Amino acid sequence: MHFSLKQLAVAAFYATNLGSAYVIPQFFQEAFQQEEPIENYLPQLNDDDSSAVAANIPKPHIPYFMKPHVESEKLQDKIKVDDLNATAWDLYRLANYSTPDYGHPTRVIGSKGHNKTMEYILNVFDDMQDYYDVSLQEFEALSGKIISFNLSDAETGKSFANTTAFALSPPVDGFVGKLVEIPNLGCEEKDYASVVPPRHNEKQIALIERGKCPFGDKSNLAGKFGFTAVVIYDNEPKSKEGLHGTLGEPTKHTVATVGVPYKVGKKLIANIALNIDYSLYFAMDSYVEFIKTQNIIADTKHGDPDNIVALGAHSDSVEEGPGINDDGSGTISLLNVAKQLTHFKINNKVRFAWWAAEEEGLLGSNFYAYNLTKEENSKIRVFMDYDMMASPNYEYEIYDANNKENPKGSEELKNLYVDYYKAHHLNYTLVPFDGRSDYVGFINNGIPAGGIATGAEKNNVNNGKVLDRCYHQLCDDVSNLSWDAFITNTKLIAHSVATYADSFEGFPKRETQKHKEVDILNAQQPQFKYRADFLII
């Protein structure tokens, strides 16, 4: 007897509704006579429409012990461009939930777009509850916004080129104040004691050179010694742009602070030399606030819990745009690898993480890493950071880790990426750790770390053009993705997961002591000069 796909669809329909896939309705027996075909009551299907048939047939559940052991090539083979594309469009639709509030799509923390992104990730894992344990880690993220600012010559009203306001700067009403140069970089109290302090109710502006200590320290000390605002000038003579920096978490002494290029700073010093009472007009409209948000952590139920393979991407974007490359691409890659990993057995536990508030200064990943107990810390064998996997004018970037300056194992991770690109005859570029992504908290706490990227605002070493023309802009949407880079790097992520989920053979054992116990915001000499996209020193 031969059944058409239409008849099989009817069988599936009735079998499902009778509660058993093994019940075959009697109307398929040859003796049964049907006056009007039952298909007339159902949506019509073409004989070759196998996908519609499959949708009506419950998929069998394969117990964990029956699954094949994870192999890199087999896991990579399950990564498909169509899946990446579908998830990218999903994220863009979620970013549009913010449009009524922001006037454009965004997934910045605190927005509906970011909240929907987190809901989306959790919904994906609802279908994988037999493979993963999912937890939320809530924290308060420090955020803020510079609405407007003005730094200009008090006499002429002329503003200064490439002046920038520091993130997390407090507001100040417009005022005219004498500009005072602070000696010795303004990092110690004695630097301020050497100048005449402002008189009671007198408003003055401190002019301080960049260097030695974080910008926040300079602002705090200036405020403590009575200055109403601060101008920090760059110490790099070739710099033409302003200082794109952050003050970090403000204190009661923090004052409104802006940055200017080296040449502008030297011009201001010359103006003071000509006129000891030289003054500026200074104003800033801004706010600083705390926003409650969450990290999402998904652990495999199986695998050795004392040998954890950890990897992460950040779930948020900047306010200016939807962030589909930065870091929607990393979010998408991790989700797709997590889905496909469920087809396999593993030897070591795998931990997928989506960090919130990366764009505010790596806040989610730092909160996680700094709040690990010593025992929890020691169980993480490696952390892999996946931020910006698909820049349109991409280069394959690998963090240039070594075991001398970084926790042991970081160099082995770098070599895994190098070997992969070489095996696929792809050129790659080694880039330094600079503090701009979520590996920072792990390295500072002794956990081997590294990662790959495809580049942001810098130029491609091969063609001299910007790597991501839409970096931190509204145009960072689905059209801003390189699908070649996206599929290649997602397969590499799958390779890294499969490799370490199988074995850490040849990988250094974890050191029992934390690598460096430092406060990256307030240390006199931070290990990295950046915190996310912001300079801190």
Curated annotation (Swiss-Prot):
**Positions with a binding annotation for Zn(2+) 1:** H314, D326, D387
Q: Which cofactor does it need?
A: Zn(2+)
Q: Which cysteines are joined by disulfide bonds?
A: none
GO cellular component entries: fungal-type vacuole
| SUPFAM superfamilies on file | PA domain, Zn-dependent exopeptidases
Q: Where in the cell is it found?
A: Vacuole
Entry cofactor note text? Answer: Binds 2 Zn(2+) ions per subunit.
Q: Which GO terms describe its biological process?
A: protein catabolic process in the vacuole; proteolysis
- Active-site residues are E358
UniProt-annotated glycosylation sites, renumbered to this chain: N85, N96, N115, N150, N162, N371, N427, N480
Q: Which domain of life is it from?
A: Eukaryota
Q: Name one GO molecular function term.
A: aminopeptidase activity
According to the UniProt entry, where is the signal peptide? Answer: 1-21
Q: Which residues form the propeptide?
A: 22-56
Keyword annotations for this protein, in alphabetical order, are:
Aminopeptidase, Glycoprotein, Hydrolase, Metal-binding, Metalloprotease, Protease, Signal, Vacuole, Zinc, Zymogen
According to its UniProt record, the EC number is 3.4.11.15
Please describe the quaternary structure of this protein.
Answer: Monomer.
The name this protein goes by in its record: Aminopeptidase Y
> From which source organism is this entry?
Saccharomyces cerevisiae (strain ATCC 204508 / S288c) (Baker's yeast)
